[in-house]
């Protein structure tokens, strides 16, 4: 690929995203599809754009993303994390701004496992006194 590109890996829940950024016009491609085509939900699109809007580089960089696993929310979060890491590799001075917004930290929350004898992770069967 291009020699003047930066790379970042992002993860959230069970999704993992590989993000490549290079100078361009602001085109975002996810799994060979446009951002608006890939994510139907506006909230997911907003999450993906957040770090770029924060550092005011929406029109300056092209993004090429491959993402696997998880659902819409997890994939959007993974892409955001990957974009943040790629931006830090692109320009280290952006780290403090992105850290203050909370984009640098990996969201470590995972789905809690279902336990034996319970309906879900914590939901107990209904209790009947009589």
From Swiss-Prot:
It comes from the Bacteria. GO terms for cellular component: cytosolic small ribosomal subunit. InterPro entries: Ribosomal_Su5_D2-typ_SF, Ribosomal_uS9, Ribosomal_uS9_bac/plastid, Ribosomal_uS9_CS, Ribsml_uS5_D2-typ_fold_subgr. Keywords: Ribonucleoprotein, Ribosomal protein. The keyword Ribonucleoprotein applies. The keyword Ribosomal protein applies. Signal peptide: none annotated. GO terms for molecular function: RNA binding; structural constituent of ribosome. Pfam families: Ribosomal_S9. One of its GO terms (biological process) is translation. PANTHER family: RIBOSOMAL PROTEIN S9 (PTHR21569), SMALL RIBOSOMAL SUBUNIT PROTEIN US9M (PTHR21569:SF1). Belongs to the universal ribosomal protein uS9 family. This is Small ribosomal subunit protein uS9. The lineage of its organism: Bacteria, Pseudomonadati, Pseudomonadota, Gammaproteobacteria, Pasteurellales. The gene is rpsI.
């Amino acid at each position: 690929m291009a020699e003047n590109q930066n790379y970042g890996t992002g993860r959230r829940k069970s999704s993992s995203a590989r993000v490549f950024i290079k100078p361009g016009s602001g085109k975002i491609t996810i799994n060979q599809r446009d951002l608006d085509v890939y994510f139907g939900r506006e909230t997911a699109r907003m999450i993906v754009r957040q770090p770029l809007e924060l550092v005011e580089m929406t029109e300056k960089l092209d993004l090429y993303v491959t993402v696997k696993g998880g659902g819409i929310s997890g994939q959007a979060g993974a892409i955001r994390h990957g974009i943040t890491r790629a931006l830090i590799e692109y320009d280290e001075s952006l780290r403090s701004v992105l850290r203050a917004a909370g984009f640098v930290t990996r969201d470590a929350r995972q789905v809690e496992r279902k336990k034996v004898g319970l309906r879900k992770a914590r939901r107990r069967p209904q209790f009947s006194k009589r």
